[in-house]
Amino acid sequence: MSYMRKVRDVFDEWAESGKDLGMETGHADAVEEMLEFSLKERSEIGEQFSFLDLGCGNGWATRNVYREPLCNRAVGVDGANKMIINARSRRLGEHYVHADLATYDPKETFDLIHSMEFVYYLADPEELIHRIVNSWLNEGGRLIFGLDFYFENTESHAWPQKLNIPMFMLKEIEWINLLKATGLKEVISWRANKTSDWAGTLVITGNN
């Protein structure tokens, strides 16, 4: 059984059991911060934009962005078929794709590419980020992603063993340097939804 197949199995089980709704609730505050940052920028630009959500789950973030007046195209992609089934059942007008995210190759480009809790499931996230920057992201577009699994969040260190899934861990500065190495500009990071007992979601973003 391949590595990505194992990850898909876990998320299919979560979608079938309704755990995707819990994930939506648990990630809502961090994703709201991320989208507020990205959508404020799009509003200031004042032009219509396209949106891609990598690892979209049941599509809740994709739907929220689709509702934005300036959004003219929203696409959500996930490797778990049952997540995509759930997303399509709630579709407003956005589009959902079931695909292996390690090899996914869209034929269209986007102004805003967003991902929450996905990239560390890849064996080689740097390769994907290079493809995003070189082929998927429009000039002037933004890549933004959020991670709860990172070195400084010690609470997350046990997750690979708990879920029996390999995960790719880096320090915050290593993620920043990785994005800079792809050619992204103005790379910044922050901790979203940080509390006294939670290290927060690590958000990394840069523009093309």
Spans of features found by a protein language model:
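Conserved class I S-adenosyl-L-methionine
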Residues: M1-S43, N64, F151
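Class I SAM-dependent methyltransferase SAM/SAH-binding core
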Residues: L52-T103
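A conserved beta-strand element that flanks and buttresses the S-adenosyl-L-methionine
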Residues: H114
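A short glycine-rich, Lys/Arg-flanked "PGG" loop and its adjoining helix->strand segment in the class I
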Residues: E126-E139
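Conserved beta-strand signature within the Rossmann-like core of class I S-adenosyl-L-methionine
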Residues: G140-D148
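Short, glycine-/aromatic-enriched active-site segment of Class I SAM-dependent methyltransferases
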Residues: D148-P166
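Short alpha-helix
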Residues: M167-T182
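Conserved S-adenosyl-L-methionine
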Residues: L184-T195
